[in-house]
């Protein structure tokens, strides 16, 4: 049976850059908040003491997040500047198309359209500076809203979002495919879709 710490760690991992609140952790795991505080402190200490771990646990704006340690910033930057990450996969393009057409949109909104979890795709697009955070939705948990950036426009040779074809609301039986088709028409992308 998995330990409480393992459960917490898995939720921190899957919540990605958005992070997770103490209330959300408590609701999902059934662990009371005082016990969660204790487990989170232990987990933070574990990462801090373990020199072989690349991660650290941070607490900001009522949310807990797993992030890479500052000492690895140059290595991460080197990877991000390599050709390996600049080519967008089908899953990344799909996520980007949804954000481009539906912005501002939450990660959960993207997940619902894609039908799969999108945390890693959103993190990747943020690292590429193609999308950015744009406030929070006034709803329980105050989820982060995402929008495209000026770099997104430059990347695809667009002058403004107005150059994206308009959605035909009457024909949107498969919203995800319509968004991808329109996005590919505009950007000239023909990459095969792939699952995250």
Curated annotation (Swiss-Prot):
HAMAP family: ScpB (MF_01804). Homodimer. Homodimerization may be required to stabilize the binding of ScpA to the Smc head domains. Component of a cohesin-like complex composed of ScpA, ScpB and the Smc homodimer, in which ScpA and ScpB bind to the head domain of Smc. The presence of the three proteins is required for the association of the complex with DNA. GO terms for biological process: cell division; chromosome separation; DNA replication. Participates in chromosomal partition during cell division. May act via the formation of a condensin-like complex containing Smc and ScpA that pull DNA away from mid-cell into both cell halves. Belongs to the ScpB family. It is found in: Cytoplasm. Keywords: Cell cycle, Cell division, Chromosome partition, Cytoplasm. It comes from the Bacteria. One of its GO terms (cellular component) is cytoplasm. The gene is scpB. The keyword Metal-binding does not apply. InterPro entries: ScpB_csome_segregation (IPR005234), WH-like_DNA-bd_sf (IPR036388), WH_DNA-bd_sf (IPR036390). This is Segregation and condensation protein B. The lineage of its organism: Bacteria, Bacillati, Bacillota, Bacilli, Lactobacillales. Its main location: cytoplasm.
């Amino acid at each position: 049976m998995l330990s409480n710490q393992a459960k917490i760690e898995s939720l921190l991992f899957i919540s990605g850059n958005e992070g997770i609140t103490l209330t959300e952790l408590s609701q999902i795991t059934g662990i009371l908040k005082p016990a969660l505080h204790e487990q989170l402190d232990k987990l933070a200490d574990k990462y801090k003491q373990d020199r072989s771990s690349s991660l650290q646990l941070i607490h900001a704006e009522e949310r807990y997040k797993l992030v890479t340690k500052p000492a690895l910033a140059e290595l991460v930057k080197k990877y991000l500047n390599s050709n390996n990450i600049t080519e967008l996969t089908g899953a990344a393009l799909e996520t980007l198309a949804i954000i481009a057409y539906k912005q501002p949109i939450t990660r959960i909104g993207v997940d619902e359209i894609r039908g799969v979890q999108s945390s890693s795709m959103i993190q990747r697009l943020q690292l590429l500076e193609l999308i950015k955070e744009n406030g929070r939705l006034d709803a329980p948990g105050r989820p982060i809203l995402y929008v495209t950036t000026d770099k997104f426009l430059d990347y695809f040779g667009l002058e403004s979002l107005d150059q994206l074809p308009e959605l035909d609301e009457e024909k949107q039986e498969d919203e995800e495919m319509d968004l991808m088709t329109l996005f590919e028409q505009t950007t000239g992308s023909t990459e095969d879709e792939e699952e995250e």
